[in-house]
Design a protein with these regions (language model features):
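Extracytoplasmic/periplasmic, Sec-exported soluble proteins
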Residues: 58-65, 122-126, 166
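Gly/Ala-rich beta-loop-alpha elbow adjacent to hydrolase catalytic centers
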Residues: 130, 166, 170, 174
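Lipolytic serine-hydrolase domain surface
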Residues: 1-33, 91-97, 101-142, 147, ...
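Glycine-rich, highly charged phosphate/nucleotide-binding loops
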Residues: 32-40
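Short, surface-exposed "cap/lid" segments of acyl-processing enzymes
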Residues: 39-107
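Generic recognition of short, well-ordered alpha-helical segments
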Residues: 65-68, 176, 220
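The conserved beta1-alpha1 loop
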Residues: 54-58, 167-168, 210
Length: 330
């Protein structure tokens, strides 16, 4: 399937995390009572889609670059399925439909700039509206997708699976949204983890690329993820060539970040594996854990300047990991 602009929808968030909509007079906030109506008008999952992806970008990403990044990741995944479709036997076909979450993440490439965007990402979710808005979006997508296997899976009746993909600070926005849903009273994830009953939505997998958060974030900050509406694993990549979550994160938070050293402590055991080449299959046993830390130090190596390889995540190996998660979700 060839990619087109129609395969991607864009959600723009204001600095306070509220949803904006494009009008003849420019961007303006969507009234709270119109959130679900706006989702229905702009973000209804098409019946042809097999998988719904929600992508949140990271630090130093312009709106145009965010869209380019999503197209790049989808193109890599498409090329991989065409090159080796037998690698993903349950992805027949693979027809993704993507929602890109954009937010103001630009700053000076300095310690002060890093702290500024770190604080903004945190404030947008904890003091602002980002977690609520993204959580409502995920709930809408879940309610309107077709359920591939019946009640406890986050796939619609026609079999649509929901995957979250974040990069850098965008991972924080997604984690806060899922955590927000875990605290809500009333929906739910082919993994061994039981489907969480009574949740506002369920996610089939969460891929966090070079997450900008402390190594103990899942134990101390995103503590509700252990009981959140996740049917599949939380998978986080890391590379010791990532200076943003290594050098800058260490100076900003006095400790290395997940994107540099992997997941540390978490509410459940953490499985650590290496990132595989597109020609090597990921066994179900390698990914079927609540938390999986993926060492990409041999893959994410390109980059110069203050961030190092922080944004070297758009690689065939990343697409292979995403496709493997989608395949094992069936």
């Amino acid at each position: 399937m060839s990619l087109s602009r129609a395969d991607i929808r864009v959600v723009d968030l204001a600095p306070d995390g509220w949803l904006m909509e494009d009008t003849p007079s420019g961007l303006r906030p969507v009234p709270a009572h119109r959130l679900d109506a706006h989702f229905a008008e702009e973000l209804a999952p098409p019946p042809w889609a097999t998988d719904l992806l929600v992508y949140a970008h990271g630090w130093q990403t312009s709106p145009e670059s965010a869209l380019t990044s999503v197209h790049r990741l989808l193109a890599l995944a498409e090329a991989q399925t065409q090159h080796d479709s037998a690698r993903y036997p349950r992805l027949k076909p693979w027809r993704p439909w993507t929602v890109l979450v954009r937010w103001p993440s630009r700053s000076l490439p300095s310690l002060g700039g890093y702290r500024r965007i770190r604080d903004r990402a945190h404030a947008m979710s904890t003091q602002g509206h980002a977690a609520h808005v993204i959580g409502r979006l995920l709930g809408y997508l879940d309610a309107h997708r077709t359920d591939p296997a019946a009640p406890p899976v986050l796939a619609n009746r026609d079999g649509q699976y929901l995957h979250l993909v974040g990069h850098s600070f965008g991972c924080r926005l997604l984690c806060e949204a899922v955590q927000w849903s875990a605290r809500e009273e009333p929906l739910t994830l082919g993994w061994s983890t039981p489907s969480p009953a009574g949740r506002p939505f369920t996610v089939d997998s969460m891929l966090l690329l070079q997450m900008a958060a402390p190594r103990d974030a899942f134990a101390n900050t995103f503590t509700a993820l252990a009981g959140a509406p996740l049917r599949g694993p939380v998978v986080a990549t890391y590379s010791q060539h990532d200076r943003a979550t290594g050098f800058w994160h260490l100076r900003a938070e006095k400790r290395a970040g997940i994107g540099y050293a992997g997941i540390g402590t978490a509410p459940a055991p953490v499985s650590t594996i290496r990132m595989l080449s597109p020609d090597e299959p990921y066994p179900l046993a390698a990914l079927d854990h609540r938390f999986v830390s993926v060492d990409a130090s041999d893959v994410f190596v390109r980059g110069h300047g203050p961030a190092g390889a922080h944004s070297d995540h758009l690689r065939p190996e990343s697409a292979h990991l995403l496709l493997s998660l989608a395949d094992h979700s069936r």
